[in-house]
UniProtKB/Swiss-Prot annotation:
It comes from the Bacteria. Belongs to the SHMT family. (6S)-5,6,7,8-tetrahydrofolate binds at L136, G140, H141, L142. Homodimer. Coiled coil: none annotated. Its cofactor is pyridoxal 5'-phosphate. InterPro entries: PyrdxlP-dep_Trfase (IPR015424), PyrdxlP-dep_Trfase_major (IPR015421), PyrdxlP-dep_Trfase_small (IPR015422), Ser_HO-MeTrfase (IPR001085), Ser_HO-MeTrfase-like (IPR049943), Ser_HO-MeTrfase_PLP_BS (IPR019798), SHMT-like_dom (IPR039429). One of its GO terms (biological process) is tetrahydrofolate interconversion. Pathway: One-carbon metabolism; tetrahydrofolate interconversion; Amino-acid biosynthesis; glycine biosynthesis; glycine from L-serine: step 1/1. Its EC number is 2.1.2.1. The lineage of its organism: Bacteria, Pseudomonadati, Pseudomonadota, Alphaproteobacteria, Hyphomicrobiales. It comes from Rhodopseudomonas palustris (strain ATCC BAA-98 / CGA009). One of its GO terms (molecular function) is pyridoxal phosphate binding. This is Serine hydroxymethyltransferase 2.
Amino acid sequence: MGPSVAPHAVHTIANPGVSAAGLVAADHAVAAAIADEETRQRDSIELIASENFVSRAVLDAQGSVLTNKYAEGYPHRRYYGGCANVDAIEDLVIARVNQLFGSAYANVQPHSGSQANQAVFLALLAPGDTILGLDLKAGGHLTHGAPVNMSGRWFKAVSYGVDPETHRIDMDQVAVQARQHRPRLLIAGGSAYPRIIDFGRFRQIADEVGAILMVDMAHFAGLVAGGVYPSPVPFADVVTSTTHKTLRGPRGGFVLTNDANIAKKINSATFPGLQGGPLMHVIAAKAVAFGEALQPEFGAYAQAVVENCRVLAQALADGGLTITSGGTDCHLAVVDLRPFGVTGNIAEQALESVGITLNKNAIPNDPEKPMVTSGIRVGTAAGTSRGFGADQYREIAGLVLETLHAVRAGTLDAAGQEINKSVRRLAASFPLPY
């Protein structure tokens, strides 16, 4: 008789399948942090120009079961099975974005605006090629050739600036730089430029020197969609953008062109060149946002964004601050704080302490370091989504000025609580839809 074998111990273990518990029950730490962020958004005034409030429908799409689906490739040419539903969604979002902007071809897979720009670089440039873009110090973007960015490391980056008096793009300088350096790629667009860009003149300069013209409309795409800012699509060889900011969609990017050859190269550069599987839950949310932007009321929203920003900028100027370029044509304004003797980083911290969020920002030819700055950037896309109008933005300007005066006088500790009460009262009068 062989040795006895002890029976296997019986262990009671949890079901190894995926949990059906909601977030609060499953992960209190994450749920608590999200709840705190919901409170912050609900009770504060958002002036960050690159932020917005999406609709409940956009949130629902992004939080859907599409999170589970892999879909490498493009509609009807995938490397995975089970893609019929995501193919339908991606077909829809491409059709909608082309309808929205009057373009012939679109790639909606870039995970961000930066990756949309990288897709253009990979598709149309070779390492060492020359690119010409707006200087970061004049309101440009990191991805337009800043030395700390891959665009400034992989390519020979040259910049143009703004007129030192008007703070508007110096188109004569653009032409001079283009003739001297003969860039392969000429870039128009930026992250802190408040004026309308002359796309026709950029097209002329690009044609003169044989450059490809790329327009990065990440900041003003929603204004283009709403008909209150000129469209770059008829002028540019390729257009990139984010889907958030003024477009009021999820965080992501896209690329547009009317050139079939460029479109093919952009597709190959995006996948497999830069990315693997697309984020289909985000792409679904993009479809929802583009559908919303196609509605007539979105034009009224875009118009209100611009009008509100002009009111805000003028009220700040009336209070003694300087608005670079003398005003704004879009959703953002850059404010020079030097008349108050306050730096951008101090202003950002002080305003956040009373419930107003914005960002420190360099002014043209700023003498301060990037983490200090002489200015702040303000925007009206988010507040306008909330329902703020001209009266509210005049009040907000007053709260900003009151806070900065308190900083200068050293009385913020005493004044801050009352300012925050005013902020919370105003925010409560215009609740978020979720």
